[in-house]
Design a protein with these regions (language model features):
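Bacterial N-terminal signal peptides that target proteins for export
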Residues: 1-8
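Primary mode marks residue(s) on the alpha4-beta5-alpha5 output face of response regulator receiver
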Residues: 25-183
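Bacterial N-terminal signal peptides
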Residues: 9-18
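Sec/Tat signal peptide C-region and signal peptidase I cleavage site
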Residues: 19-24
Length: 183
């Protein structure tokens, strides 16, 4: 094998192997072996907040207003626990960083939880490896982004409302922002 052909072969091999961040962006569907354990963990962690009036007791407060997609439905209104977000990259199934609520007819319904890890907290100790929770990989969102956040990893778990396109997909086509309050 010539040096030139070896260089071409190694370049092609490198191009065909997705980088961990690219993998984290691509793999967000139901790829874990047992999704029920993560769904149950998310329900256990968020059960006290089924009533949105209890969210503040858990230090969850509304941010961003209702997040909707251009074609893919919405996420809903995020209630964020800043302490969990700023915990230096700790991933715990019993401490979701955000609760997602859908508002319809003046009533808030808990639909999902979101686990969020800032890339600057995760990457130094876990180079080339996206976070995972109970086998489910997080997705990567670069900076700049529509949320105004630094680069981050996230994992949505539609624990309280069925998502027909996947339990761990970011957007839910059955969620709407039409009745959401403007914060």
């Amino acid at each position: 094998m010539t040096v030139r052909s070896a260089l071409i072969a190694s370049t092609l091999a490198f191009m065909l192997v997705p980088a961990p961040r690219a993998l984290a962006q691509m793999v967000h569907n139901d790829v874990q072996v047992n999704p029920d354990s993560l769904i149950q963990a998310a329900r256990d962690a968020s059960r006290p907040f089924l009533d949105v009036n209890n969210a503040a007791d858990g230090h969850y407060f509304p941010v961003l207003g209702c997040v909707s997609g251009q074609q893919d439905g919405a996420m809903g209104v995020h209630y964020l626990n800043g302490g969990y977000l700023l915990d230096h990259g700790v991933v715990r199934e019993d401490q979701p960083e955000a609760l997602l609520y859908e508002f319809r007819n003046g009533k808030a319904t808990l639909t999902a939880v979101e686990y969020i890890v800032l890339a600057e907290d995760w990457d130094p100790d876990h180079p080339m490896q996206p976070p995972a929770l109970l086998g489910q990989l997080f997705t990567y969102t670069s900076f700049p982004n529509r949320f105004g956040l630094k680069a981050f990893y996230s994992l949505h778990v539609w624990a309280w409302k069925n998502n027909p396109i996947g339990t761990f997909v970011d957007w839910n086509p059955t969620v709407s922002c039409d009745d959401a309050p403007t914060h």
